[in-house]
């Protein structure tokens, strides 16, 4: 007996049953209300949890340019290997290694690199190897070195030879093909013969990478259908200090010459320290703009306001902030970024964009200044940005911040200052319990409708155990369901909520610092969390206009654990209702669509689990996923029974 199939059928039957004695009478007005922005549901990327190097950025070699403070971190060496920076290939990444003869015919000189928690190799996949090399001496004639992919049993599964014949730096390429699937392989390089050779920028990418990004992770983003893409952070925008802040100009131009930067998250959490966590910036602003275009999302770059991370610095720390008199280079970075994104090819930064391969503008419409700053230091700096951006680019929307908290003195002060400065959007952040999300579904009902709009730039429900630490579950159904309930309030208040992005986006299963996260991955594959499916269902059923949905003249935002919103999609000519039953009992609901005679046939999509701690994992990727069925209304009424712990989307 197929028990799972029977339960699924019973669930769908319950969700669409016709009845006259419903417990709840919902009224949906078919008169279009507030416009829902195309950017309403989106994604936020930050290089945390090895989200960039070791994650979305498909480079498989760690410390490929030997620029980590420990120059050979990530490498095992054998034989005669030395590091040098004399007459380098790249001025901003000057270090390279010399492989010299080991001095005995039975000895080897070489290097091994295990990548990020091992190298994931797939059977039949081609891997593009790149290296810059030269003969070590002017008198040298020919040097050879072997490259091999090695499995967990230390056996080569692919190999090739590179021959170097010049004493000038040149780029060499080769293709390796794995003959088996390996989760934790490595790259081995060793010198053949007696001639010494210098090598730099040792690189290995899967051949199916898109613009240097992992194909599976790009698809995970594209399938969300996001409307907005905020990048590159987050706290890394600020840096541990100003010297390590994220500087976009270091992330454009040839990837080989982008200087290394420390990652803000390498030492943040004592229980999850990663001293080898750096940013090669191979995934830079140009790539972020390309990715935005690829997945159909508006780009929202965030830049430093001149304040280092306020969690890690006191306001009086010497390297914590730049004084306002010296702020102009930071403002110029913002103005130049807009030119890079939108400027003509005759402009300095527009020409660089064209030289990199994209002469057409990226159509940037928004820019964020500062991450989650608080206190008076922030608005006094932001004011200078606002003045100059407004003067030169009046059409660009400016996003400010209300700080790291969802309420309180600093939050109120932040909003007051953002109104005073006249920013277009205010970035709110809240990482709270599922109960908070359920209780705050009406958060925006009474917000001021004039002035800046809300950007819910970072949010996620955090389930805690008795020790107040995140549970073993990476992401679970309880959290996802509470987020779905909360999002009915975002949707209902689309006149004041302009856009929203869940955070964080990515996490390596062996290299995370923070959880929960939307997408988890190892070196071979990824898994979409239950929360991912909530985000996807909202984004693909966004609609263009809010419809009033009420019970007894009031919004449905928690009475008997029910939450609901309704929208109309003008393009698809579709009516869409979202209902969350967060309670422990089934609810019978009649929905009457005023102004319609016949609603007709439609589709029902449900996300349900009886286990609040249910998760999707790499071992069981589809444990909790949406189910779709047909549904039919009777006249202008839809009568449904929504089981406990269910998120349901009705589309007609």
Regions found by a protein language model. Name each.
Residues 582-652:
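C-terminal beta-sandwich/jelly-roll accessory domains of carbohydrate-active enzymes
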Residues 23-280, 298-300, 313-328, 371, ...:
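Extracellular and organelle-lumenal recognition/adhesion modules and their flexible linkers in secreted
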Residues 192, 232-233, 305, 310, ...:
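Active-site groove signature of glycoside hydrolases
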Residues 123-125, 545-582:
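Surface beta-strand/loop "capping" patches
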Residues 387-388, 394-397, 415-418, 424-541, ...:
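Catalytic-core region of carbohydrate-active enzymes that cleave or remodel glycosidic bonds
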Residues 179, 185-186, 206-226, 281-291, ...:
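An active-site-proximal structural segment forming one wall of the substrate-binding cleft
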Residues 132-138, 177, 540, 580-582, ...:
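Solvent-exposed strand-to-loop "edge" motifs in beta-rich extracellular domains
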């Amino acid at each position: 007996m197929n028990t799972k199939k029977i339960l699924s059928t019973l669930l769908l039957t319950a969700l669409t049953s016709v009845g006259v004695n419903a417990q709840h009478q919902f009224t949906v007005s078919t008169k279009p209300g507030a416009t829902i922005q195309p950017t309403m549901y989106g994604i936020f990327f930050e290089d945390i949890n090895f989200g960039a190097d070791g994650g979305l950025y498909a480079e498989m070699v760690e410390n490929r340019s030997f620029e980590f403070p420990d120059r050979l971190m990530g490498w095992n060496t054998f034989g005669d290997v030395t590091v040098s920076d004399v007459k380098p290939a790249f001025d901003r990444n000057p270090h390279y290694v010399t492989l010299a003869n080991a001095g005995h015919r039975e000895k080897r000189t070489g290097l091994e690199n295990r990548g990020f928690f091992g190298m994931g190799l797939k059977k039949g996949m081609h891997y593009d190897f790149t290296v810059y090399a030269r003969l070590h001496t002017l008198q040298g004639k020919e040097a050879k070195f072997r490259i091999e992919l090695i499995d967990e049993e230390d056996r080569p599964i692919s190999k090739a030879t590179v021959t170097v014949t010049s004493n000038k730096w040149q780029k060499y390429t080769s293709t390796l093909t794995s003959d088996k699937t390996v989760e934790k392989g490595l790259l081995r390089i060793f010198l053949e013969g007696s001639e010494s050779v210098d090598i730099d920028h040792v690189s290995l990418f899967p051949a199916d990478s898109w613009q240097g990004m992992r194909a599976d992770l790009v698809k995970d983003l594209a399938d969300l259908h996001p409307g907005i893409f905020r990048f590159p952070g987050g706290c890394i925008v600020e840096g541990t200090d100003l010297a390590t802040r994220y500087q976009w100009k270091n992330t454009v131009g040839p990837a080989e010459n982008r200087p290394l930067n420390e990652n803000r998250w390498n030492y943040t959490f004592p229980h999850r320290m990663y001293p080898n966590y750096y940013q090669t910036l191979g995934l830079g602003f140009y790539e972020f703009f390309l990715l935005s275009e690829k997945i159909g999302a508006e780009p929202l770059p965030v830049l430093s306001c001149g304040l280092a991370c306020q969690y890690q610095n006191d306001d009086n720390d010497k390297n914590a902030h730049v004084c306002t008199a010296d702020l102009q280079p930071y403002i110029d970075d913002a103005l130049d970024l807009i030119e890079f994104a939108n400027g003509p090819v005759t402009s300095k930064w527009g020409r660089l964009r064209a030289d990199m391969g994209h002469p057409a503008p990226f159509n940037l419409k928004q820019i964020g200044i500062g991450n989650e700053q608080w206190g008076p230091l922030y608005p006094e700096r932001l004011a200078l940005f606002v003045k100059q951006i407004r003067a030169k680019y009046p059409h660009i929307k400016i996003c400010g911040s209300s700080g790291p908290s969802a309420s309180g003195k600093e939050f109120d002060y932040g909003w007051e200052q953002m109104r005073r400065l006249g920013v277009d959007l205010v970035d709110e952040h809240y990482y709270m319990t599922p109960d908070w999300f359920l209780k705050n579904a009406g958060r925006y009902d009474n917000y001021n409708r004039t002035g800046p709009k809300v950007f819910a730039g970072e949010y996620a429900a955090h389930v805690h155990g008795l020790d107040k630490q995140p549970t073993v579950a990476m992401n679970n159904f309880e959290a996802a369901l509470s987020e779905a309930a909360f999002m009915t309030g975002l949707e209902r208040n689309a006149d004041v909520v302009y856009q929203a992005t869940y955070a964080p986006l990515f996490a390596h299963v062996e290299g995370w610092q923070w959880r929960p996260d939307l997408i988890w991955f190892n070196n071979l594959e990824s898994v979409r969390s239950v929360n991912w499916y909530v985000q996807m269902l909202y984004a693909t059923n966004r609609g263009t206009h809010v419809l009033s949905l009420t019970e007894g003249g009031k919004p449905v935002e928690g009475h008997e654990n029910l939450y609901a919103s309704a929208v109309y999609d003008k393009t698809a000519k579709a009516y869409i209702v979202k209902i969350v039953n967060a309670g422990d009992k089934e609810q019978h609901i009649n929905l009457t669509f005023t102004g319609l005679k016949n609603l007709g046939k439609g589709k029902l999509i449900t996300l349900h689990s009886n286990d609040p701690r249910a998760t999707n994992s790499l071992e069981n990727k589809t444990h909790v996923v949406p189910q779709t069925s047909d549904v039919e209304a009777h006249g202008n009424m839809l009568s449904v029974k929504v089981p406990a712990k269910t998120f349901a989307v009705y589309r007609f």
